[in-house]
Amino acid sequence: MRHRKSGRKFNRTSAHRKAMFRNMTASLVEHELIKTTLPKAKELRRVAEPLITLAKNDSVANRRLAFSRLRSDAAVAKLFDELGPRYSERPGGYLRILKCGFRAGDNAPMAFVELVGRPLDIEAEEMDDDEE
């Protein structure tokens, strides 16, 4: 019985699941916007948000812990140099999940996962202010 077992399996082995979310998190940190299925997006939140919280406190130990979870030097550097300071005043809720229809092949629900307050959002808000 699976009573009270949290997390989705996605019909993958634990190593495959771990690698998938490691890669998705690194891509999210690098590009700040990714498109994936809705269940994967919801599960990605559980992996990515604690890493951003970790990046708020820049230390060698925290960088090593983040690297052990991401295995990407570029992602860790961006996480601590850009994202940590950006969200230093925000108490969680760093990701936004936007539903974007269904995939053509199998009708799977798709979603965009983006970082809240990413630079393109700020530029769009400034453009809206200029129009008014």
From Swiss-Prot:
An example Gene Ontology biological process: translation
- Give a GO cellular-component term: cytosolic large ribosomal subunit
Q: Name one GO molecular function term.
A: structural constituent of ribosome
- Key words of the record: Ribonucleoprotein, Ribosomal protein
Do you know which SUPFAM superfamilies this protein is assigned to?
Prokaryotic ribosomal protein L17
Please give the superkingdom of this protein's source. Answer: Bacteria
- Pfam families named among the record's database cross-references: Ribosomal_L17
Q: Give the protein family.
A: Belongs to the bacterial ribosomal protein bL17 family.
Which HAMAP family does the record associate with it?
Answer: Ribosomal_bL17 (MF_01368)
NCBIfam families associated with the record: L17
Q: How does this polypeptide assemble, per the annotation?
A: Part of the 50S ribosomal subunit. Contacts protein L32.
Question: What is the name of the protein in this document?
Answer: Large ribosomal subunit protein bL17
